[in-house]
């Protein structure tokens, strides 16, 4: 029989065992068992920690990475060898050293995870950026993170500032760096990198303003991987106690870009767990369904609109998606109605809901296991080692002290800007972004609530709600609607459908029909673009 894990320690005095709330300090504490982290004083990179978790006996032949479009795969032995070889080129030929920032600008191609791990393994700082950004946006990002070199896809290189040294991925120069050359010295087996040193600089979403550069430490990434390793051991232990085999390593489809915190962390997790990542250069719903079927994908990280599409489009039912076991939801709130509709159509797929920020190195809270996943509308419980405060309405940002001061208070608390609450069992519920609340005649209207209602209508494929300026009311809730194919739903029907389900002040007052809702790569609605579109359309055309 497998050894039983020790029970989690009792909560400190004054902390409620169900919710984790301390009435004296008004702080919510994680009720999860603390993870098994290496000593903080031990020099270690995130890459070294990830590789230390791998079991060599199960790796040969298993793909680490697969290109969804071509089917080209890289096995774990080949992946590890490629990382070591490239790390040697970066150290010996390019002269990169710990703390040097390297901008990585490329779509989700097989070379990118190899490059990311090679950079982290020598203590260099990975700074992944969106390959479809403009030259002005790259100039802003470069001014913040100050990279000594940029690695760019051929189609992107010309958009980068001229003063930044650029190595084109796939070029002869890059090939020489990546080549295994017995005459070239290897990178040091262990570099003098503290866990508190910066491992990555990620750029936060620009949905409410100019992007900010967020510093993520090796310790941040190690804690994330440790959490997943602990969960894997728990699942294996429970399977052994039940006389069952533990589940095989996941095959994860990654339609989320690797420059986003969600995609970046998912690849890190996948490698540390010895799993397979199937990469998509850009999200396409039909292509994603084909990839799930072709590669027998078991895990899909996605934003809520993907669930809506899977429920509403017949193509999802025509495909063999029987391998799919888990969908990890992030990027935006998931409404109860959408979750329940999905569960009725795909009863064997577990929905793991989570919540995180770039500034928090990803996950803050998540559901764990089938029972917690039934808490529809919640993003789960606080992760190990985390605390939170609900207040009345990090390492910091790189090169932007003003933004850091506005986001991290004097006691070190990260202000997330979310309207949220905990229930008596410690489940966290995200209502909406404070900055996105619509102010109608003094009332606060959460657009996400109205979007969930609209998306439940069978004639609506997608929806977004924005504030429309009004002299009398201040702001009016305005809905942008994408009709389902064959649907002829009218503006009046849209407004009536919502009005029957909300208080009078939450009614949708304006409606516009569009072919698509603009979204960030992580699936967040780009409300600023819709506001500009609404103003340019003019009242007479609405």
Swiss-Prot record:
PANTHER family: 4-COUMARATE--COA LIGASE-LIKE 9, LONG-CHAIN-FATTY-ACID--COA LIGASE. Carboxylate--CoA ligase that may use 4-coumarate as substrate. Follows a two-step reaction mechanism, wherein the carboxylate substrate first undergoes adenylation by ATP, followed by a thioesterification in the presence of CoA to yield the final CoA thioester. Pfam families: AMP-binding, AMP-binding_C. The keyword NADP does not apply. ATP binds at residues 204-208, 212, 353-354, 358, 418, 433, 524. PROSITE patterns: AMP_BINDING. It catalyses: (E)-4-coumarate + ATP + CoA = (E)-4-coumaroyl-CoA + AMP + diphosphate; (E)-4-coumarate + ATP + H(+) = (E)-4-coumaroyl-AMP + diphosphate; (E)-4-coumaroyl-AMP + CoA = (E)-4-coumaroyl-CoA + AMP + H(+). One of its GO terms (molecular function) is trans-cinnamate-CoA ligase activity. InterPro entries: AMP-bd_C, AMP-bd_C_sf, AMP-binding_CS, AMP-dep_synth/lig_dom, ANL_N_sf. It is an enzyme of class 6 (ligase). (E)-4-coumaroyl-AMP binds at residues 262, 331, 353-354, 358, 435, 439. This is 4-coumarate--CoA ligase-like 5. Its EC number is 6.2.1.12. Its cofactor is Mg(2+).
